């Protein structure tokens, strides 16, 4: 088994990837397709990855379980979730069960899904989606704050896609420094506690558990780490 087979599952686990998504990704790999009973092999490996990755990324697994628990508590009271990122962007995490409407046409029956804010919250989607949505919102906040800083420094040309930051070659050193500084500023704050405080304020009647305790990582090391920015 080579690194490529485990890479995607490992990288997407912090985003709340599901067993089925890992399985589907493995089914597309040449190494799996070359095997007899490739689909069974893909599912076997997917289950092993789901079991093993949390044993290696222990703290990430704890945070994911905590987020899912909090999302489940709120969703079971038929409520969505809202929070403000460190960049000031308001995020709404609200998946509602659509209303199904069957329409008979001349030659077939069409099933139409109608979405509105009167439908009940979809608990499963709320729980499954919270990790990815929070992580993406924090990634976006980091990018927004980095761009604001660079703009203030006079940079006007950007090529940004999610976690890929691009500027002209002459500005790369400045980008290197600024994106590190903004990352440190964001994560020097108690991000999970701030997130929970917002939820507790919005849902005062609910008992939401405290986040996992933080470790002893010195976030300031990001400023001098040679491999943080590549």
Annotate each predicted stretch with a short phrase.
Residues 1-230:
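Conserved catalytic core of nucleotide polymerization and phosphodiester-bond processing enzymes
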């Amino acid at each position: 088994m080579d690194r490529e087979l485990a890479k995607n599952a490992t990288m997407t686990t912090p985003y709340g990837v599901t067993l089925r998504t890992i399985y589907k990704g493995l089914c597309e790999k040449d190494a799996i397709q070359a095997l007899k009973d490739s689909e069974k092999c893909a599912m076997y490996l997917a289950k092993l990855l789901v079991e093993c990755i949390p044993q290696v990324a222990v703290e990430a697994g704890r945070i994911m379980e905590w987020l899912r628990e909090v999302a489940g508590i709120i969703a079971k009271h038929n409520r969505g979730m809202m929070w403000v990122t460190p960049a000031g962007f308001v995020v709404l995490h609200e998946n509602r069960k659509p209303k199904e409407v069957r329409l008979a046409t001349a030659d077939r029956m069409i099933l139409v899904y109608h979405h509105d804010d009167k439908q009940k919250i979809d608990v499963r989607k709320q729980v499954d989606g919270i990790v990815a949505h929070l992580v993406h919102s924090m990634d976006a906040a980091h990018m927004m704050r980095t761009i604001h800083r660079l703009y203030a420094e006079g940079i006007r040309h950007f090529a940004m896609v999610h976690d890929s930051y691009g500027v002209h070659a002459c500005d790369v050193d400045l980008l290197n420094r600024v994106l590190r500084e903004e990352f440190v500023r964001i994560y020097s704050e108690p991000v999970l506690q701030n997130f929970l405080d917002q939820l507790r304020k919005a849902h005062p009647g609910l008992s939401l558990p405290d986040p996992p305790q933080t470790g002893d990582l010195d976030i300031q090391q990001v400023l001098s780490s040679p491999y943080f920015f590549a």
